[in-house]
Amino acid sequence: MSWIEKILPRTKSPTKSNVPEGIWTKCGQCDAVLYKTELEKQLGVCPKCNHHMRVSARARLNQFLDQGERTELGSELEPKDLLKFKDSKKYKDRLVAAQKATNEKDALVVMQGKLKGMPVVVAAFEFAFMGGSMASVVGARFVKAVEACLEHNMPLICFSTSGGARMQEALLSLMQMAKTSAALAKMSEKGLPYISVMTDPTMGGVSASLAMLGDVNVAEPRALIGFAGPRVIEQTVRETLPEGFQRSEFLLEKGAIDVIIDRREMRDRLHSMLSKLHHQQA
């Protein structure tokens, strides 16, 4: 022991604090450390930089619809590996893994409920289920949502977040673009409003069909929206894309969408829109 150590009093190292795991998270945009409970109150929007984080389909539906009686539509539908598809992994194994990870049968959840007392049907994509890819069950559930609207004279809202068509279902997946578009045409014929809300990301076959067919096309701030991704486009055209290309602000400026709405204002703003649209078309 050195002479300095003999003079100085010994200090005890601070004991490790008993902070429970999982109560903090980090913003992917500004790196701010956030209290999860506070983030939930903000509906998954960073209070520091306004970054809209991805939320699960059920969390979004719980945030958006009134508490109380809700009916899930199409929950009995389950995906099947009709093509016996295999890439680096069997499709049926990918389905099992996705179902286990998300506790969902497929990538779209549909609920019939109320928005500030107004009867509505709301569909929400689950991005954690194979990138929110559109396949046979997704298309069938969306059609069930439309059929419920037609039967009960209700408006439809869809929150999209998807990488596009599910390649493991090949042509069966691509068929859903036409199937969902044809269903929405029936809503239009009957004069029932459909509001499409595009969240980050909304790409591929979903953006090329049901996501862009709203009577009002809404987007969350800074959402990536397009068909092919920016890297693919840059490699194809061999040019550098403009700053913010394919982000919702860029699309609004070019007239591709109608409005950008903060998630925390979504209930009030969409209820206001539907009050006018449904009244006019009733």
UniProtKB/Swiss-Prot annotation:
One of its GO terms (cellular component) is acetate CoA-transferase complex. Belongs to the AccD/PCCB family. It is found in: Cytoplasm. Its EC number is 2.1.3.15. Keywords: ATP-binding, Cytoplasm, Fatty acid biosynthesis, Fatty acid metabolism, Lipid biosynthesis, Lipid metabolism, Metal-binding, Nucleotide-binding, Transferase, Zinc, Zinc-finger. This is Acetyl-coenzyme A carboxylase carboxyl transferase subunit beta. It comes from Pseudoalteromonas atlantica (strain T6c / ATCC BAA-1087). Its main location: cytoplasm. Transmembrane segments: none annotated. It catalyses: N(6)-carboxybiotinyl-L-lysyl-[protein] + acetyl-CoA = N(6)-biotinyl-L-lysyl-[protein] + malonyl-CoA. Component of the acetyl coenzyme A carboxylase (ACC) complex. Biotin carboxylase (BC) catalyzes the carboxylation of biotin on its carrier protein (BCCP) and then the CO(2) group is transferred by the transcarboxylase to acetyl-CoA to form malonyl-CoA. Pathway: Lipid metabolism; malonyl-CoA biosynthesis; malonyl-CoA from acetyl-CoA: step 1/1. A zinc finger (C4-type) spans 27-49. Binds 1 zinc ion per subunit. Zn(2+) binds at residues 27, 30, 46, 49. Its cofactor is Zn(2+). Residues 23-282 form the CoA carboxyltransferase N-terminal domain.
